[in-house]
């Protein structure tokens, strides 16, 4: 089993606010905090000494810390993505996004001159900027794994797999870290499309699906 020294995760956070939840689920299936904590892929694939970059929203800060601890990492600091464009918000207009940085074991960063913020414009929903990936490569050693990755498959795609050859897993990534599937800590496989436990999985060449409908939907998304 491949052990990764750097893992990036961009979970599909589920919102309690009905409007925000509907907005997210228009783009992809979401997962609850407890469901994310149950995932075994990070503890199983993280090297003894490794780094975790965990994307979270400002409203999911406490949830992000809970998930990081459940995956066996100790929170150290945060990175901030500053977006020139102003977004929505319940109290203040959002223009930032957080990345929680945690460590397992005693792995230091590669450099000591990297700032804890970066500025980059918004991309398509949930897609993260190239500037972030460059920061990760400058700060943390490989091999690299990205969970919940998104790959457009276009010639100008700027995902971690297309740019840097990372191992990826996600319903729109087309990759898998171990030729297997995401599982809960109890060994139950999760559907590669809706992330729900699958009692009788339907296996395909690029993942496991709870139904033919999910398998077809994932194929269509990859095809664009």
Which residues does each predicted region cover?
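Class I S-adenosyl-L-methionine-dependent methyltransferase catalytic core
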Residues: 1-184
